[in-house]
């Protein structure tokens, strides 16, 4: 998922004056925000990543991993970052919600994204799920205007 984001959204991140990516619901350990920062900085070196987690204990445990370009915040779908992020990634988060709730959450998250402008399609929400070891993935990419793509990926 991260490689796809860097490849398809890297130019948009480079164009942004303050490229912020949010890893929403990173889980028990902070590895996914750390990996996201590494991947995105190959495409857009000024990108900052904010890991957002609903569990305060997980945020506290992640704080020792903070460094230039990487921060952790307590929160949820309100996305507690200043401004409008260029990217929100929510992996394995919405699969625990009822299907009827997903469209409202997508709309809420897309409302937080950077708006489209001259030469810009605006921010990107990438929401999806994978198996336990990350070999099979599916995700949808949405912008402020609505769905853009759906991707199925597998590693054999």
Which sequence ranges carry the predicted segments?
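A short SAM/SAH-binding and catalytic strip from SAM-dependent methyltransferases
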Residues: 85-103
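Local beta-strand N-terminus motif with an aromatic residue
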Residues: 18, 84-86, 90, 122
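Class I (Rossmann-like) S-adenosyl-L-methionine-dependent methyltransferase catalytic domain
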Residues: 1-24, 28-67, 74-79, 118-156
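Hydrophobic/aromatic-lined pockets within catalytic cores
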Residues: 41, 98, 114
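Short, surface-exposed, charge-dense and proline/glycine-enriched linear segments
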Residues: 101, 105, 153-156
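A short glycine-rich, Lys/Arg-flanked "PGG" loop and its adjoining helix->strand segment in the class I
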Residues: 95, 103-123
């Amino acid at each position: 998922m991260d490689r796809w984001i860097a490849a398809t959204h890297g130019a948009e991140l480079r164009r942004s004056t303050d490229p912020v990516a949010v890893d929403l619901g990173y889980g028990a350990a902070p590895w996914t925000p750390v990996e996201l920062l590494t991947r995105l900085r190959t495409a857009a070196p000024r990108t900052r990543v904010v890991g957002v987690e609903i569990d305060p204990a997980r945020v506290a445990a992640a704080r020792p991993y903070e460094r230039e370009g990487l921060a952790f915040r307590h929160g949820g779908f309100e996305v507690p970052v200043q401004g409008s992020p260029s990217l929100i990634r929510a992996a394995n988060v919405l699969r625990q919600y009822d299907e009827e709730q997903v469209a409202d959450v997508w709309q809420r998250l897309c409302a937080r994204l950077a708006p489209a402008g001259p030469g810009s399609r605006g921010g990107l929400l990438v929401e999806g799920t994978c198996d336990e070891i990350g070999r099979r993935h599916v995700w949808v990419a949405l912008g402020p205007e609505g769905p853009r793509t759906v991707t199925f990926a597998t590693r054999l």
